[in-house]
Amino acid sequence: MSSDSTGHIFTPGRVRPVAKVLVATTAMLAFISFWRAAAIVLNDLASSAYYAGGEAEQFIGKTAPWFILGIMLFSYAVRAIYVESCSMFVRGGVYRVVKEALGGTLAKFSVSALMFDYVLTGPISGVSAGQYLVGVLNELFVYAHIPIHLYVNGTAAAVAIAITLYFWWENVKGVPESSGKALRIMQLTTIMVIVLISWCFYTLYARSGWHLPPAPLPQNMKLDKGSLGWLDRYQWAHTITLIAIFVGLGHSVLAMSGEESLAQVYREIEHPKLPNLKKAGLIIFIYSLVFTSLVSFFAVMIIPDNVRGKFTENLIGGLSMHLVGSFPVRLAFHVFVVVVGVLILAGAVNTAIVGSNGVLNRVSEDGVLTDWFRHPHARFGTTHRIINMVVAFQIITILASRGDVTFLGNLYAFGVIWSFAMKGIAVLVLRYTHPQDREYRVPLNPVIFGVEIPIGLGLITLVLFAIAVINLFTKPDATMAGITFTLILFTVFEISEHRMHKRQAGAAHVELDQFNLAQEAELTPTSVGVAPGSILVPVSTYYALYHLEAALKRVKGLDAEIVVLHVRMLRRAASGEYDLDPDQLFSTIEQLLFTKVLAIAEKEGKPVRLAVAAANNLWEGILRTAMNLQSSTIVSGSSSKMPVTEQAREIGLAWERMPEPRPRLALEIFTPVGQEYIFYLGPHAPRLTPKEIDVLHKMWLKFSEKLPGEELHHHDIIHFALTELEREIAEGQGDEVLERLRQHLREIQTRRLNPPVEPKNLPAKPN
């Protein structure tokens, strides 16, 4: 006989009563500064500078830099749409919010176009990285007189596949994204940009005869079958200036790819969120305007017309090799440009996988995709099926492109512009359906006869749709591929949603327990129903509940208070600015997880409390929950990605990032074979081994004999040793101390025993 999470008694032979699951509606977030937020977005947005200018010039000729500049200026207006979207107080994912605005059919098309965007981001970034890498390697081979010449497109495709597979495995393992890494990459990129722009200006100063690109007028543009596509047969497409301008903008829209990343990082930006979001947006605008547009202008002004065509897919590399200066210096800078480019472009490949995974997880949370897609990996607990599917699409795309960036750019432009256009129309409709639920509005909203007219938002959306429609006709291959992909994904969504509704309308799974979802803003001892000093057991996947079994076996009686917590990770994804509803946080995956939790609790005859919370950093979310619940102990399973000591170090770093006052907690980590490791979070007395205590006692005896009449305690010896160590470091002997410590650790490594284990009964309350 045992009790459920609310105190009911489990009696063999009768149906288990409905257990309560407390869902925290306020997400526990680890916040970042607007500088880091800008760096994350720029890692995605700046990658387009490596290929956008060259791709635009291939289609519309030497006027391309003006259109790139126009797109970069227009991007600030598009960014205002995302700022307004972030400021809205609405709940639901990428599908649910758009469905409310546009209806189910258009919402599915919107998500399908967005997925086309994400699926293409990886291949074009990976292939572009390969193009730059192959270009510099071939130049190095020539310079070193090595008789090797790499086939550019084929090798670029191989590099792209290698990068994609690397990040596929990283995402399957669940390696978290790092804002610090993004910031360091952008710092390195900034150095490269400053050197490049300064060197370009000096080159123009040193050379005479340079001139600006021709004005963006029809007579100066290359308007042919390649740039006009299906419109080439109509004479008006060659002569009407407005049409020509939209054609040019359509071929330059790749320069704006990555804008959607701003909304993805919104929830992570520190308070005050909206002002900091605007600051991040301004930084992104200035940086991308200077970098992307100036690269395009300098390429036309510095690289001779007769050779520039060779560098359309390696534009910055070609620019670096045509600056003034000696060849070795230019080649060295070219290598630096490529290293930075590969870092940025490879990061964009990872962003594409993370973003696609986030979007499809959101769609699954919205009830469109079945929970089969969100099935957790048996070892890592990640949504590996979604990741596998996305990466498979990306590798197929890379193989189909055969390393041709132009082919990929055409496809990518389809997804980019249509995802922007659908976002614009959704925010425009939400302006009327949720008129008060926002802190910010896109400017130009005159009130006529008491009715607000969103002129600014409407004009931006109209321009986006005009470019999108023009692109349908000027990029026939991309149109056919994009429509085919969108229809396939739309069909998958339609069938999957139908199955989900049918399942929800029918009988519940007989093998799954039913749960009563209770909502609270935060998890507290009162809301969960536990006293201070509880034991917090985080669980992520039903494949790994051995640590819960260990905790339940060790508690005494029925008065032990164990809280089982499942943290729903909030990924960076489209419409990530919208909070999830409680029912989206608790799907069939969580239902199955807690069903198994209750089965284990019933087997052990011990009660548990069940809770779900959302967070964007796993351990910071768990630690904040432990602090809110005033827990005394966290019991965790060992990580499948790192050793236990490294896992404990990561948790300790997360503890250090918490605001004061930080809770003092015992951390118990169990391995699948039952081995236990105990760590303490926060300052604590060290647990000395018997041998260490014996050494300390012998030293005390020796010093007591040498210092008769002095009051000497064991702790005085420890204090003296620490003070001497601190003095040596202060006197500049830190490196020597570090080396002695390293040598000591190596000497004891082979005989180091497992950490001593605490008494076998975990206290339900602090002693």
Question: For the regions a protein language model found, what residue spans apply to each?
Answer:
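Loop-to-transmembrane helix boundary motifs in multi-pass membrane proteins
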Residues: 104-107, 149-161, 268-292, 361-399, ...
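Membrane-interface "cap" regions at the ends of multi-pass membrane proteins
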Residues: 1-52, 87, 96-100, 104-105, ...
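Extracellular loop-to-transmembrane helix junctions
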Residues: 53-113, 123-163, 287-293
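Structured cytosolic domains appended to multi-pass membrane proteins
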Residues: 510-676
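Hydrophobic alpha-helical segments and their helix-loop junctions in multi-pass secondary transporters
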Residues: 190-229, 297-305, 423-439, 494-506
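C-terminal membrane-solvent junction of multi-pass transporters and transport-like membrane proteins
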Residues: 181, 372-385, 423-472, 476, ...
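TM-loop-TM module centered on a large, flexible mid-protein loop between adjacent transmembrane helices
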Residues: 103, 139, 222-231, 280-348, ...
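A generic transmembrane alpha-helix motif of multi-pass inner-membrane proteins
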Residues: 404, 409, 416, 448-502
